[in-house]
Amino acid sequence: MPGLLSAMEGFCVIGIVIATGYVAARMRIGGPSAQMALNRFSFFVSSPCLMFAILSKEKIFEIFHSSIVVAFFSAVLVGVVFLILNRLFFHMKAADATIGALNSLYLNSNNIGLPIATYILGNPALVAPILVMQQAVFTPIGLTVLDVTTKGKVSAKEILKQPLHQPLLIGSLLGIAVSAISAKVGFFVIPSCIYDPINMIGNSAVPMILMAFGMSLHGPKPLQDKSNVPAVFTVAALKNIVMPIIAFLLSYFVMGFRGATLYACVVLAALPTGQNVYNYAARYNVGLSFARDGILFSTLSSPIFIAIIAVLLG
């Protein structure tokens, strides 16, 4: 049971920080804009610094591990499953169905993924390939479909510019570049007087992210749109149950992973839906409550299934 114990200790750490954020919001500490300030600072400053600091010192061949194949195909398959279910049962319009597919496959590699990778899996660099994959592949595809279905046209310029609006992706790519250069020349090329402050700022990312998430729980009640209830629970089940099962099958039978690698693949597949999905829904003003509720319920149920995974595989 060491895997379960490690997972529970990790969730205890994460839960206490989230609860601190929730209490701070209830007591109105920091004022009404505190959550936004924490979110924006962590998104634009702390998290990119963290990813740069981690990846720049990670061996280049360990960053792009073959486990990315599992993450990619498990996400694609679960997205296809939602689209099939929508065609058979929900009959949502194309734009709403796109939000549903993203709700089902898009991992919260930052707000929840970084803390879980840090405190449960012991290696925050594990989320980097997933982050790059989502921002470079799934985000452009999703935004292209939303452009077509809501505007009737594709803005190629906006799609191509999207990665430039993602500080996490930029920080990750810069870290990967430094790792590659360091491997080439045989020593770490960033002097400590530059690396140390970047690393120091990056260390603030996880607590800020978790407290901001805790603050977000003090807000409007979920499931106000009753027509979305079946779809909301469906995307939560797809995200937290079906996707980890697919990841296990691919990891074990196709890729031949065992031990810590198998465990990490399945745990990361059980991460809740990324909050980016709500940002995309808000940008196109489509499926807002659906996106928010899907994220909330996948986030609330994710620890349960990660604990089960820890019992079975940890």
Regions found by a protein language model. Give the residues of each.
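Alpha-helical transmembrane segments of multi-pass small-molecule/ion transporters
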Residues: 1-314
